Amino acid sequence: MNLHEYQAKQLFARYGLPAPVGYACTTPREAEEAASKIGAGPWVVKCQVHAGGRGKAGGVKVVKSKEEIRAFAENWLGKRLVTYQTDANGQPVNQILVEAATDIGKELYLGAVVDRSSRRVVFMASTEGGVEIEKVAEETPHLIHKVALDPLTGPMPYQGRELAFKLGLEGKLVQQFTKIFMGLATIFLERDLALIEINPLVITKQGDLICLDGKLGADGNALFRQPDLREMRDQSQEDPREAQAAQWELNYVALDGNIGCMVNGAGLAMGTMDIVKLHGGEPANFLDVGGGATKERVTEAFKIILSDDNVKAVLVNIFGGIVRCDLIADGIIGAVEEVGVNVPVVVRLEGNNAELGAKKLADSGLNIIAAKSLTDAAQQVVAAVEGK
């Protein structure tokens, strides 16, 4: 679950991290009043969406008058911002962040993720602030410096100083950087985060560090013990199909293709998407119905998949280990009858009672194509989309 920039900075403030004075506003009038609270300009106005690339898309602007603030708010509030990280529809702009402008001397990067290879929380710092860290990692990986947190000791001040020295910081900036490092690490661990970024972390012309931007991603599996983060959730920024799937404990991610995929198991789902691509198809989604694929969940999965108007065919790929394939077949038949599926449905069953399940599908009299293998399933669903 992602947070908005203004929400990230609210958390920064609670943990004593320096950030520009700012207010999230939902109307042009509130935006003007926020500027008055902040004081003399210039100010920075920022569209609040769960996506990067806002500046290049016109969603961030330095303004020198309240008239400009009102014009920016009137232009963006209630609209959708399209960036390179969104789809063609963009994300809705429901808040504008109004902040005091900062005199930027130099831009740095500081962030942390859970590194699966080392099984540690790893902090990354770079002198290449203001640039996507993925781009830095690809083009100039030697400019990224890392430290891993020991789960027994947690973050240590010497690690912050180590990163500061590698960034070429001196004097009071080393102390300020270490404080920010310790604060970010504390937020990451106490709030069960999966990602935290300050990009850019700015050295002002006055010689101080300030968190100019903030990006936080919470671990969805830990939200049950983070009630204040749950309250910050903005479902308007999420795909409604993904929200509906979460209510049924279905793992769904919307994509841009036209072949709906329903699979039990995340690994099998990724493999299914790969083989669909291999045979020239484009998956419309990732959908893992999990081990408890009941008729009700299969029905709901069909509803979610078919709510995407781009879907021209559905591929169901089930491996019967925990669940029996004949019960899955009953669920598929019931779901197709209830939902009224009007696109071709290709089903591949393998494992426990697979033959009985295939027989039930064949005897159902419905427009369900039984595949003999995963390759056969991919070929048939691609052919169905192409009208062959």
Curated annotation (Swiss-Prot):
Single Gene Ontology MF annotation: succinate-CoA ligase (ADP-forming) activity
Binding site for Mg(2+): 199, 213
EC number from the UniProt entry: 6.2.1.5
Keywords tagged on the record: ATP-binding, Ligase, Magnesium, Metal-binding, Nucleotide-binding, Tricarboxylic acid cycle
Pathway entry: Carbohydrate metabolism; tricarboxylic acid cycle; succinate from succinyl-CoA (ligase route): step 1/1
Positions annotated to bind substrate: 264, 321-323
KW NAD (keyword) present: no
SUPFAM superfamilies (alphabetical): Glutathione synthetase ATP-binding domain-like (SSF56059), Succinyl-CoA synthetase domains (SSF52210)
Binding-site positions, ATP: 46, 53-55, 99, 102, 107
Residues of the ATP-grasp domain: 9-244
Cofactor: Mg(2+)
Cofactor note: Binds 1 Mg(2+) ion per subunit.
GO biological process: succinyl-CoA metabolic process; tricarboxylic acid cycle
GO cellular component: cytosol; succinate-CoA ligase complex
Catalytic reactions of this protein: succinate + ATP + CoA = succinyl-CoA + ADP + phosphate; GTP + succinate + CoA = succinyl-CoA + GDP + phosphate
This protein's record includes keyword S-adenosyl-L-methionine: no
InterPro entries in the record: ATP-grasp (IPR011761), ATP-grasp_succ-CoA_synth-type (IPR013650), ATP_grasp_subdomain_1 (IPR013815), Succ-CoA_synthase_bsu_CS (IPR017866), SUCC_ACL_C (IPR005811), Succ_CoA_ligase-like_bsu (IPR005809), Succinyl-CoA_synth-like (IPR016102)
Record-stated family: Belongs to the succinate/malate CoA ligase beta subunit family.
Subunit structure: Heterotetramer of two alpha and two beta subunits.
Role noted for this protein: Succinyl-CoA synthetase functions in the citric acid cycle (TCA), coupling the hydrolysis of succinyl-CoA to the synthesis of either ATP or GTP and thus represents the only step of substrate-level phosphorylation in the TCA. The beta subunit provides nucleotide specificity of the enzyme and binds the substrate succinate, while the binding sites for coenzyme A and phosphate are found in the alpha subunit.
Descriptive protein name: Succinate--CoA ligase [ADP-forming] subunit beta
Originating organism: Salmonella typhimurium (strain LT2 / SGSC1412 / ATCC 700720)
Gene: sucC
